[in-house]
């Protein structure tokens, strides 16, 4: 009996440690990452990627909203999924819906031209040493760095590695 309780507690402790340091499961809510990700998909998120390395342009990430919480006690931060577009120190500008980094247009083959008719401009903004510019793939329906500003490195939870469910072609590869 005591052995079973200890085994259960050890398994629970291991699960908590893994979730806090290595891997997390997240669920997509909303249309901001369509067509890459869809509402209801379950994602495998690697926390380890950013413990061992730095975010790269094009990474699909889970982030915390700065200053937003899901509970009144401010214990659970609100999270969202976006794509890393701008890296620390870079200058980002949007002209007629096209993202420019350091004056050069960014190639974004993952965007759906029929869905993304967002043609507004955003004046150039240089990111700080610890800031990332994130956007949703569905620019017409995304609350992202255009609105909330750059995301500090500490707010990046991890990199989305795989869609766990539903099964099908993996939209994050290739």
Question: Where do the language-model regions lie?
Answer:
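Acidic loop->beta-strand submotif enriched in PP2C/PPM serine/threonine phosphatases
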Residues: 115-131
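Mid-length scaffold segments of soluble, non-membrane domains
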Residues: 79-105
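Active-site loop architecture of trypsin-fold serine endopeptidases
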Residues: 142-147
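Phosphate/adenylate-binding glycine loop and adjacent helical scaffold
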Residues: 136
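PP2C/PPM family metal-dependent serine/threonine protein phosphatase catalytic domain
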Residues: 102-119
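Protein maturation boundaries and topogenic segments
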Residues: 1-79, 151-174
């Amino acid at each position: 009996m005591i052995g079973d309780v200890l085994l259960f507690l050890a398994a629970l402790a291991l699960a908590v440690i893994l979730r806090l340091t290595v891997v997390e499961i997240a669920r997509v809510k909303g249309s901001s990452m369509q067509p890459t990700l869809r509402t209801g998909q379950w994602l495998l998120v690697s926390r380890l990627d950013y413990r061992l390395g730095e975010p790269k342009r094009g990474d699909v990430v889970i982030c915390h909203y700065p200053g937003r919480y899901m509970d009144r006690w401010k214990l659970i931060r609100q999270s969202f999924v976006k794509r890393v577009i701008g890296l620390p120190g870079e200058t980002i500008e949007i002209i007629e819906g096209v993202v420019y980094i350091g004056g050069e247009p960014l190639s974004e083959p993952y965007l759906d031209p029929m869905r993304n008719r967002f043609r507004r401009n955003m004046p150039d903004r240089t990111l700080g040493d610890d800031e990332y510019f994130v956007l949703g793939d569905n620019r017409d329906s995304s609350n992202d760095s255009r609105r909330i500003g750059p995301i500090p490195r500490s707010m990046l939870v991890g990199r989305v590695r795989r869609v766990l469910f539903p099964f099908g072609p993996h939209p994050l590869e290739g």
